[in-house]
Amino acid sequence: MIVYSVFIFAVLAISSVTGIFLPGGGGKKCGGHGEYGSGVIIGAERPKK
């Protein structure tokens, strides 16, 4: 379980960092729109649509 949480943390960190470098402020869209960064991963594991 600890490994899973660490993996999620790493994924969110990497996706948020990549979102910053994406055009259009991808970091702000994380976790909701599923377009940039962690939004894609979170949307895949826990779809809230």
UniProtKB/Swiss-Prot annotation:
Protein name: Fungus-induced-related protein 16
Species, as recorded: Caenorhabditis elegans
